[in-house]
Amino acid sequence: MAMAAAMGVASPYHAAHAAASTSCDSLRLLVAEGRPRRPRGVASSSSSSSSAGRRRRPLVFSPRAVSDSKSSQTCLDPDASTSVLGIILGGGAGTRLYPLTKKRAKPAVPLGANYRLIDIPVSNCLNSNISKIYVLTQFNSASLNRHLSRAYGNNIGGYKNEGFVEVLAAQQSPDNPNWFQGTADAVRQYLWLFEEHNVMEFLILAGDHLYRMDYEKFIQAHRETDSDITVAALPMDEKRATAFGLMKIDEEGRIVEFAEKPKGEQLKAMMVDTTILGLDDVRAKEMPYIASMGIYVISKNVMLQLLREQFPGANDFGSEVIPGATNIGMRVQAYLYDGYWEDIGTIEAFYNANLGITKKPVPDFSFYDRSAPIYTQPRHLPPSKVLDADVTDSVIGEGCVIKNCKIHHSVVGLRSCISEGAIIEDSLLMGADYYETEADKKLLGEKGGIPIGIGKNCHIRRAIIDKNARIGDNVKIINVDNVQEAARETDGYFIKSGIVTVIKDALLPSGTVI
């Protein structure tokens, strides 16, 4: 069972980095004696002239090229905890994830039985020794704020580093009466706060991606290539490449061209030699494209220059600021990430990512990695109780009560209550925010009400059941008519990509058939 790892949220990564500090001293000397750094934001000479007729490998690393094991130490000088500010972008209204975003911000959507989406980038930061983190949002931020304050509190990383995880909601002022207009605009509106921090770089992250990444190696590559901006890049085959914004690089790994979801000849023109970024020859032939992950390291003074001086009206990093920086001659470098990554922007992607953690023998994404745990709110719930149930290929969260039912290839969230005779297949149950007492259930029964959870003899297949849903007895949620798209909000559910999603706090009377 996936148990919360947040009981001592600061200690695992803080102790590890403290223990590694001695072994890093010799490497710090090598970094200190590297090539002289040019002023940030000043355009460097062209890559052709710098190459001088020879090909130079950039200092860019991927998980395949450089091991993430403890034997491969990453040594930043100065340390990431004091020199890097993490900025997580909460995204827009989350219309593609609706109705999961009806009552919550997108980063607050539950994930993997015990967690929320925001726990992924925050945990990646903490495991990478980045302990100063802001989360920017403007829609339904109450539950996100509550989760972050309970999960991470203050003094993340210890009193020495004075770490924090803080939500910054969009606000109107006499100087700026507008809400966030995009990713770059969101950062611009809070530049006055970010520039007060004595850091070298800003790490820009998305709040709706599922992946595990060592940001210290990302930042190390940024510093060692003397870049103004470094963009995390994902290798792609031709089939997937048409759905992403692609980048073209020169022989040093420097980004020279962008194309948004290209097709045909334009797609062919974006092919690159991915061995430059660390892929072996076989993988490079399979993956001849690189896509932007929407993750950036941007030097502090470069960020200030770009958002205030060069592109004061730009709203988006990916389509405006980053290509613009390339056009004015800044050094924009690619950093290859060759691991599992999923943009959880749609109901279908969210559904597949959750069920992917049940995959055998190795899940798409594992919550059981001791070297880089995923932290979350400590809830102090009892162990789950399973009574005469048949549970296969599933993940069960904390505090569940499961009685004489069948569960297969499903994810069952916190405090889920599943009654006798129920069949749950290929589904995601998000659970509940609270327990109902036996007295509450008795009173509900006397009034003809339905308790939170899954009633007796229900059959649920290929569905998402949001929190606190009340599903009566003998309900079938199996998409009997194979409907692909339907908006039945007044009835308590939506269907997107053939997946039935029951809305948070919805009530489905006994005998309902969907």
Curated annotation (Swiss-Prot):
Job of this protein: Involved in synthesis of starch. Catalyzes the synthesis of ADP-glucose, a molecule that serves as an activated glycosyl donor for alpha-1,4-glucan synthesis. The chloroplastic isoform 1 is essential for starch synthesis in leaf chloroplasts and the cytosolic isoform 2 for synthesis in seed endosperm.
Region (Disordered): 35-74
Lineage: Eukaryota, Viridiplantae, Streptophyta, Embryophyta, Tracheophyta
Tissue: Expressed in leaves.
Family recorded in the similarity comment: Belongs to the bacterial/plant glucose-1-phosphate adenylyltransferase family.
Cellular-component GO terms for this entry: amyloplast; chloroplast; cytosol
NCBIfam families for the chain: glgC, PRK02862.1
Protein name (Swiss-Prot/TrEMBL): Glucose-1-phosphate adenylyltransferase small subunit 2, chloroplastic/amyloplastic/cytosolic
Catalyses which reaction(s): alpha-D-glucose 1-phosphate + ATP + H(+) = ADP-alpha-D-glucose + diphosphate
Keyword Lyase: no
Keywords, sorted A to Z: Allosteric enzyme, Amyloplast, ATP-binding, Chloroplast, Cytoplasm, Nucleotide-binding, Nucleotidyltransferase, Plastid, Starch biosynthesis, Transferase, Transit peptide
Activity regulation summary: Activated by 3'phosphoglycerate, inhibited by orthophosphate. Allosteric regulation. Inhibited by inorganic phosphate (Pi).
Residues passing through the membrane, by range: none
Subunit comment: Heterotetramer composed of two small and two large subunits.
